[in-house]
Each structure stands twice: as C-alpha cells, then as structure tokens.
C-alpha cells in the first residue's frame, strides 16, 4: 500500500564505493566508515508496505544500504510487505529483536558484503513468502567479492508455510553467492522444501567447526552453521541441500548435521501458518528440544550476544518480546498478548482506494469514481480536470510556514466539478470532526488581531484563475 523505510549510510560494501539503492532514484549508499551512524530505530513497526515502483522493483520494509555499526536497531517489525522484510546491502549495522511477518519475498536478506550481527530474529513466512532468510554476498558472477558478507545471526526462529494447499515451495534459508556467516541457536520449522540450501558457493569454506576469534576477525571467509540448530523437516536428508546446476562448487568441510524433529513450540499448529491464531504461541516449551538440548555460547565470547536458556528467537519460555506491539499480538493472533488492539486509522472515512492528487494536471484528466483523494500540496491545473459526483477530496494539514494545500486552476485550465444534491463533491480536511477544534490563533484581512481558529484554517481552498476582465492591470 506504500513503500517503506530506506536508510543509506557510509559503511563499506563490496560494490563501488558508492552505489545507487533500489526502489528510489539516484540516491547512493556505502563508503569507508564501518562505525557510521544512521540514527536509531527502536520499537518501529512497518506494516503493509513494499509498493511496486517499476518492473521487478519493489521497496523492502526496512532497507539498510551501507548502514554502519553506530546505528541502533532493536524491536522492529515488518508485516505484510510485498518484497523483503529487512534487507542489508553491505554495511555493519547490528540488530536485535526483529520480526518479519507474512512477506511476499524473504524475511531477511543480506548481500553486498554485509558484516553485522543479529540476535532474536523471528520470521513467519505465511503462504506467500519465498525464504525466511536469503543470505548472499557476491557481485555479478564473482562469488568471492570482498568484503565477503558475514552475518552472525544467533537465536532465530524461522517458520515456513508448511506443505498444505497454497503454500509456496522454498527452503527456509537460501545460502548463495559465496556468502560467509555464523548461525547458531536457531530453529527452522514447517518448510515446504529443504531447511537450508547452498548455491554458487565460490571459494567459501562451509563448516560446523567455529574458527577461533582471531580467524573470525581477520578472515571471515567461512560459513559456520552450528550442529545444535534445529531443522524440523520431513527427513534428515532434506535438512540440507545443494542447488542443482550450481556454477561453483559447494563442498562442506564437514559432514553436516543438525538436530532433527520438533523444537517444542508452546503451541504452533499447521492452521496457524497462514496468519496466526488466538492460541498461536511460538515460544519454546520447557520440556522441548529448544530448551533441553545443547545451546551455543555467544560466538567467540562476543559481548553483543545475550546468553540464553533456550534456542530460537525467544531466549526463554517466558520472554515474549512481541506481546506488546507485534501485529500478531495486536490483531489477536498470538497467545500471551498484552497489546489491546490496533488503533483505528484517523482516516477512517477514506475509501479503501486512496490516491494522492498530482502536483500538476497539464493534460485533460478525469478522476476516478469511488476513490478517496488526498490533497497534500498546492495542485495546479492547466488543462481540464473533471471530478465525478460524490467525490471527496481530503486535504492534509501542514506545519506553520509551509504552503497550505490548495487546488489552483490557472488561466486556460478548467475545473469540471458537477455534483448533485445527493452526491455532492466535497473538499475538506482529512482530520476527524473531533480533531478539528483548535485554540490556536491567526489574523485575517478584516481582523489584524488574533482570532481563535476553532474549526477554521485546516487547509487552503479552491482558486480559479480566468481570462475575463477586471479593473486591475491586464494580468495580476
């Protein structure tokens, strides 16, 4: 329904020093400062985004382009995004407590030399998601481009769409383009395919033996996947796979294993996979494998990672960090929720089909019927603009000092607005009636002393400019 958040920083990537980000025009990211800060995102929800801006070009829920480790990111959620939930194009930003719900593509996507850390990551794909995680690195056909991506993701729960009718086929983690990384304390459940699939590995070493810290820091040229991770697939043979027709060898250095069988969720049924339910509870049970099995210590003693008592995105049987703000909790689709609901939109009078008026109308245009229109700026009409009967145009309020939204028909233009007694055409503020009254003051031509605005002055108005005579100069 809209785009998303895009943060562009100056941390390193493995593409050009600066590159153009997808989804918008001519904005660059990347640089030489791994500690760069793009600010902070804490308890931020991005819902119903990912609008298409061109062929095969959608906007991710939250895009990190060359974002550095000085940026603070925790307790953020993307829900119902058309493309990926969280995508990292290079950079070094570290993240905690992130949830990606019901994406049209991947929950998490790392690429272009991303070297960052993440803990407590939750994905539920629904029936439309492609992968819970797409882990990439290379540039073009060069799978060994440097710096090589090396995400360190620990304590994650990835829930696929299952094998029922309508579920999309795909592995939960797709490891591609020579990426490195460290993955531990994870739960992979309900895939419609493999748990983890390798493709186009380059010279990467794939191992289940975690190298020493000195190797980690100086040469992150390996992909480590802990044998303590749980992959709940139909058979152990389908836990791991190599993509057929891969262009570069994928030869693990070890015999790969993972814990098989159910992780021991408190309550997750196949009927919950499409959109959750009132009883859906992805926390681990005390007697399940997630809590009773061997847990991974923080990799190389890294203080960024918290010690946990259970595997998965929830570090204990009681730590439901989604309960107060997640779409699942606020929509009544999760047990243990404390969120009381999703606040009603202040634009509740708008129709389901809402369109922003253009800044200019230089050719004859007929607005669509059964559409709500938003007037957010001064709109100039130099051709014919026809507004159907019954249409309502809602004007946004603007801060003091900003030009008020107005519809301006310039000389040579025409406004054709033919309503009726039963279907009038209305221009009004987008604000609800209860929000219109204001104690602010302003001056008018007839009253230079301040008057109380009350319900007045919420937007500009209509201005029609023609060619008929006046007693002023020919034009004024």
Regions found by a protein language model. Name each.
Residues 393:
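Extended, charged catalytic domains and RNA/DNA-binding interfaces, predominantly
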Residues 1-369, 374-388, 396-414, 420-476:
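Extracellular beta-rich repeat passengers
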């Amino acid at each position: 329904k809209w785009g998303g958040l895009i943060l562009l920083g100056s941390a390193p990537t493995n593409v050009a020093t600066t590159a153009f980000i997808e989804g918008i025009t001519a904005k660059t990211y990347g640089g030489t400062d791994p500690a760069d800060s793009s600010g902070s995102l804490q308890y931020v929800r991005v819902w119903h985004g990912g609008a298409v801006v061109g062929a095969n070009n959608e906007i991710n829920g939250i895009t990190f382009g060359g974002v550095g480790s000085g940026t603070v990111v925790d307790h953020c959620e993307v829900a119902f995004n058309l493309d990926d939930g969280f995508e990292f194009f290079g950079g070094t930003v570290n993240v905690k407590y992130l949830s990606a719900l019901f994406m049209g593509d991947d929950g998490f996507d790392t690429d272009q030399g991303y070297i960052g850390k993440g803990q407590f990551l939750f994905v539920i794909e629904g029936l439309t998601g492609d992968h819970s995680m797409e882990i990439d690195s290379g540039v073009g056909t060069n799978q060994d481009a440097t710096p090589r991506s090396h995400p360190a993701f620990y304590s994650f729960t990835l829930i696929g769409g299952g094998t029922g009718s309508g579920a999309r086929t795909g592995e939960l983690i797709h490891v591609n383009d020579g990426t490195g990384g460290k993955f531990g304390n994870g739960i992979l459940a309900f895939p419609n395919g493999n748990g983890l699939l390798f493709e186009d590995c380059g010279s990467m070493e794939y191992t289940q033996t975690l190298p020493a810290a000195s190797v980690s820091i100086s040469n992150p040229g390996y992909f480590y996947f802990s044998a303590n991770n749980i992959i709940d697939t139909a058979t152990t043979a389908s836990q791991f796979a190599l993509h057929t027709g891969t262009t570069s060898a994928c030869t693990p250095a070890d015999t790969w294993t993972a814990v098989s069988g159910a992780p021991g969720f408190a309550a997750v049924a196949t009927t919950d996979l499409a959109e959750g339910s009132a009883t859906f509870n992805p926390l681990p049970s005390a007697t399940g494998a997630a809590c009773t099995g061997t847990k991974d210590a923080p990799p190389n003693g890294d203080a960024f990672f918290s010690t946990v008592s259970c595997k998965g995105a929830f570090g204990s049987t009681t730590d439901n960090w989604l309960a107060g703000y997640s779409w699942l909790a606020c929509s009544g689709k999760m047990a243990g929720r404390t969120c009381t609901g999703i606040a009603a939109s202040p634009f509740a009078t708008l129709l389901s089909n809402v369109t922003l008026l253009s800044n200019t109308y230089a050719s004859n245009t007929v607005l669509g019927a059964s559409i709500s229109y938003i007037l957010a700026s001064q709109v100039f009409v130099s051709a014919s603009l026809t507004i159907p009967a019954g249409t309502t145009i809602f004007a946004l309020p603007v801060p003091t000092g900003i030009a008020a939204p107005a519809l301006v028909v310039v000389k040579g233009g025409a406004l054709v607005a033919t309503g009726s007694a039963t279907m009038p055409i209305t221009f009004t503020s987008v604000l609800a009636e209860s929000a219109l009254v204001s104690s602010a003051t302003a001056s008018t031509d007839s009253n230079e002393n301040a008057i109380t605005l009350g319900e007045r002055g919420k937007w500009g108005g209509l201005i029609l400019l023609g060619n008929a005579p006046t007693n002023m100069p020919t034009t004024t």
